UniProtKB/Swiss-Prot annotation:
The gene is yheH. The keyword Transport applies. Belongs to the ABC transporter superfamily. It comes from Bacillus subtilis (strain 168). The chain crosses the membrane at residues 18-38, 146-166, 223-243, 245-265, 347-367. Residues 18-398 form the ABC transmembrane type-1 domain. This is Probable multidrug resistance ABC transporter ATP-binding/permease protein YheH. It is a multi-pass membrane protein. It is found in: Cell membrane. One of its GO terms (molecular function) is ABC-type transporter activity. Residues 430-664 form the ABC transporter domain.
Length: 673
């Protein structure tokens, strides 16, 4: 299972949004990273540019500065070539500026004494006559720079505003695409679960499945929303910063480039430990969800049997284990986050000082203040995305583990092949041919089952608990598939039908009726838009639920909450009956359907069933044998085999297992009476 490829495949579903976001981000980063270059130009060309060579100009121009009645123009501002015989310089010494009206051979350490400017560089030293400039005179020399500085400031401000809008755009698009990816992923997971075989859920608590759909996908959402955004943003920032560093100084840029393999090695070491801890955390979190779900569902039993302490102890063990691994993860994050970033940052600045400090000792290698400013600025900016990446390592690993759990579920083979409901109603003839079945390999629960139910017949399945009654119906619905033999409907093997087609012929009523949150009507129709309100009411009337509708203020629109907890078990079963009948099935399955119904309600349903059985093949599982006396066929099962078959009179005449069960129940009834 390749987690990265699957995550990438989901991202490509919304590649237009992602590509647009990355383009916007690239433009925004480019605009923002232009700032230090603008600062460098302002420092070198305008603020410190006053120390460049000045020439006495023969004619005035717009860049000329008047000083003592003479016009001076800076070397890089000359519009026309002039004689360089008359050269002048301005030097800063401390907080003061001095004018030197002659050529200067070299630059170096500067001192001023008795109107003399002395410049020393190594063994060389030379003194020049110098005049200290007043504030007004200094301002005159800076005046030509004001326009350029204002333009650069406006450009910098404009780029910042420009960058903000593009940053907002990329952030919005990345968030939107991430939300859509997770929406799609959750839909896929939930849809896949709908198609999973019942066998999958036999050994998997519901809380664990819920945790994968909610908690794990939410962790993946953090990957796309936060981690992906941070990594893409930081990656583009780092690329832009390294490009700028190479433009400024290739040698030092290569030194800074060593940070990249350090981060890679860092991530490898981190993942080695974080992956294990996160797997434990997510697994225990699923167990906690399962435990909470189980406890809430069984709260009545827990309180009735005073099992609160034991339940709390089991929960505390899980919670303590979760706390332990969370602390281990915290220690790992503390060790490998800001501390290491600060160490790398300090090493980078040591290299910077070493490089520029060494260069300053060589007159030919003196670096401008603007370049130094830009380098320091870019180095500071470089560690912002590095810090961002490091801070997301924990979320990245958590998301990878969560993605692995979600994709593991998605890779589970489902049994619900694509198919449409049957276009024509089946006749209802059902045949089992030498069927054998085992839930666990080597432990057969059905052995060589063979029987035929003709159209419209009622077939009752009786036997002790574990004899295989429900397993026969599980095979008929294809909740499970038989290892041997075949099951046919109207002469056609059910294994040659899609499950959608097969189940469109059948309706089922279980021993424990399950109602969904919604209304009485939605529980009957299961939100099938093809079913009209009148059809819903008719189904309820057929099963004798009309008194229930009259009792409820809103009729079929009466809300149903928490599995129908406000309704009696008999009322819930009536709605379950109506649900089965509303879809007009050719085959009706009643799995202990009257077990939770009082005698009066059972009498109502029995009358209704006499009507709805007409034209339908009905399978009944019943422990109360008095309810199946009129069955056309009764199959008695024992240890997975049919040991007796026939109608009530025939089986009573045999005086076998059926006779014994019937007489036993009859005796109990008389005893109670």
């Amino acid at each position: 299972m390749k987690i990265g490829k699957t995550l990438w495949r989901y991202a490509l579903l919304y590649r237009k949004l992602l590509i647009t976001a990355v383009l916007l981000l690239t433009v925004a980063v480019g605009a923002e990273l232009t700032g230090p270059f603008i600062g460098k130009k302002m420092i070198d060309d305008h603020i410190l540019g006053i120390e460049k060579t000045w020439y006495e100009a023969a004619e005035k121009d717009k860049n000329a500065v008047q000083f003592h009645g003479v016009s001076y123009v800076r070397e890089d501002r000359l519009q026309e070539p002039v004689s360089k015989a008359k050269e002048a310089h301005i030097y800063q010494v401390g907080m003061a500026f001095y004018f030197v009206d002659q050529a200067v051979s070299f630059d170096g350490n500067r001192t001023v004494s008795d109107g003399k400017l002395t410049i020393t560089n190594g063994d060389k030293s030379r003194a020049y006559a110098a005049e200290k400039l007043t504030k007004q005179e200094l301002f005159q020399f800076y005046q030509p720079e004001i326009k350029g500085m204002v333009l650069l400031i406006c450009l910098y401000g404009g780029l910042l505003v420009f960058s903000v809008f593009f940053q907002y755009g990329q952030h919005y698009l990345l968030q939107m695409s991430a939300n859509r990816i997770i929406q799609k992923m959750r839909q896929d997971v939930f849809s896949h679960i709908q198609k999973m075989p019942i066998r999958y859920f036999d050994n998997l608590p519901a809380g664990k499945v819920v945790a994968r759909i909610t908690n794990d996908t939410e962790a993946i959402r953090d990957l796309y929303v936060t981690v992906l955004s941070t990594f893409v943003t930081s990656g583009i920032y780092m690329f832009g910063i390294f490009t700028a560093l190479f433009l400024l100084d290739v040698k030092l840029a290569f030194v800074c480039l060593a940070i990249v393999p350090i981060i890679w090695l860092w991530s490898v070491i981190y993942r080695r430990y974080a992956s294990y801890y996160n797997q434990k955390i997510r697994s225990i979190n699923s167990d906690i969800n399962a435990k909470m779900n189980e406890s809430i569902q069984g709260m009545t039993i827990i309180q009735a049997f005073r099992h609160q302490k034991e339940t709390m102890r089991e929960f505390e063990e899980l919670n303590e284990s979760h706390f332990y691994f969370q602390n281990r993860m915290l220690n790992l994050n503390s060790l490998m986050s800001h501390n290491l970033v600060n160490v790398i940052r300090n090493l980078a600045f040591v290299c910077l000082i070493w490089h520029f400090g060494g260069a300053s000792l060589n007159a030919a290698g003196i670096v401008s203040i603007g370049v130094l400013y830009a380098f320091v600025d870019y180095l500071n900016r470089l560690f912002q995305p590095i810090t961002g990446i490091v801070n997301q390592f924990s979320k990245l690993e958590l998301a990878r583990v969560s993605a692995g759990r979600v994709f593991e579920l998605l890779e589970e083979k489902n049994t619900e092949e694509a198919g449409e409901p049957a276009k024509e109603r089946a006749l209802g003839r059902v045949e089992f041919r030498d069927v054998s079945f085992a839930y666990q390999e080597g432990e057969e629960v059905l052995k060589h089952i063979s029987f035929t139910a003709q159209k419209g017949e009622t077939v009752a399945l009786v036997g002790h608990t574990g004899s295989g009654k429900s397993s026969i119906l599980n095979l008929l619905f294809r909740f499970y598939d038989a290892q041997k033999g075949d099951v046919l409907i109207d002469g056609k093997s059910i294994y040659n039908m899609s499950r959608q087609e097969l189940r469109s012929h059948m309706g089922i009523v279980l021993q424990d009726p399950y109602l969904f949150s919604g209304t009485i009507g939605s529980n009957v129709s299961l939100d099938d838009e093809r079913m009209t309100e009148e059809e819903i009411k008719n189904a309820l009337r057929q099963v004798g639920a009309e008194p229930l509708l009259k009792k409820l203020p809103k009729g079929i629109n009466e809300p149903v909450i928490e599995k129908g907890s406000t309704l009696s078990s008999g009322e819930r079963q009536l709605i379950s009956f109506a649900r089965a009948l509303a879809f007009d099935p050719a085959i009706l399955i009643l799995d202990e359907a009257t077990a939770h119904i009082d005698t009066e309600t059972e009498a109502v349903i029995q009358k209704a069933l006499d009507v709805v059985k007409q034209g339908r093949t009905t399978f009944v599982i019943a422990h109360r044998l008095s309810t199946i006396r009129n069955a056309d066929q009764i199959l008695v099962l024992d240890k997975g085999e049919i040991v007796e078959r026939g109608n009530h009179e025939e089986l009573m005449a045999l005086e076998g297992q059926y006779y014994q069960m019937y007489e036993l129940q009859k005796g109990q009834k008389h005893s109670i009476a």
